[in-house]
Amino acid sequence: MSRFFSKKYSALTAYVPGEQPKDQKYIKLNTNESPFPPPQSVVDAAKSEAAMLQLYSDPECTPLVKKCAEHFGVKTSQVLMTNGSDEILNFAFMAFCDAEHPIVFPDISYGFYPVFAKLNGIPYEEIPLREDFTINVSDYVGIGKNIVIANPNAPTGIALPLSDVERIVASNSDNVVIIDEAYVDFGGESAVSLVDKYDNLIVTQTFSKSRSLAGGRLGFGIACPEIIADMNTVKYSTNPYNVNRMTMAAGYQALVENEYFANCVEIIKQNREFTKNELESLGFCVLDSKTNFLFAKSDKIEGKVLYKELKSRGILVRHFTLDRIKDFNRITIGTLEQMQRFIETVKNIL
């Protein structure tokens, strides 16, 4: 680091994203992207804005917010569009957390949560998952601190039922509860239906997973109008034009193409069950996933060794070094052909 780097960030361990190889020789099963491209109408919508890139985008994302509100059955004042769901999460941390308002989250979850906390000088606590990697809801009921929970969780893939989410939200009425629903379309229950009932609830989602726009960077939050206004204050104090014109147009059209994306999700879910069954037949322990990935380990091979062997054979998966999960690998679900290739490669390695 340089001699000018602020001391408040010098001890910060940055988030480490999944590998993005520059060549095309790998089957990428490591970053939970969709294996399916967006439909042509979405591509065309993005292209239609390219000729106007000399102009700033609409900071309010007006047509997209209206379409998103219509899609989810909420008011436009309850929606905030952002540059990926990471940005809405960071806005929430900045707006509602500080030394007097710490935040808690599971010890095995999205790696950005502790980074956001440290970046913004927010005290935080990581609450251990149970031995089976499920969340103990009682740990969060009435805890009296801000909360963020990924549901379904990542990297485990395990989902909480909506009734448990509501218990947590209802019992912490004086604190903000953020439900990160990046993977909800693959089998989870969305908490959007609870937003009108609880003014302390923020639901975040992304277009990166089920709507094939990871490269476009588009996410959003749904909450009561007052919460959205607070986060807009943070947004307009940092990056008013946070969603570019092409992404905004692509996102709008992606909300039109519901049938296409629902079909893609169904195929991914089928491929997930195929892969799970095949891995279990090989002796793997595979957690119950409601996402577009599987979290699996084998007693026959260490997690890091399997990761390296797969990479040497042209397949990327995600390995984590955290002690409790170091024997696991997270496997994104791709096309059936990709998953068949993955299974055959695993068989050869074992």
Q: Each predicted region: which residue ranges?
A:
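N-terminal "arm"/small-domain region of PLP-dependent enzymes with the aminotransferase-like
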Residues: 1-55, 143
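PLP-dependent aminotransferase class I/II
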Residues: 60, 200-280, 284-287
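Phosphate-binding glycine-rich loop
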Residues: 62-102, 120, 300
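PLP-dependent aminotransferase-like
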Residues: 95-150
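Active-site pre-lysine segment of PLP-dependent enzymes
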Residues: 134-143, 155-177, 181-213
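PLP-dependent enzyme catalytic core of the Aspartate aminotransferase-like
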Residues: 163, 308-313, 318, 322-350
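Conserved PLP-binding catalytic core of the aspartate aminotransferase-like
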Residues: 268, 281-313, 329
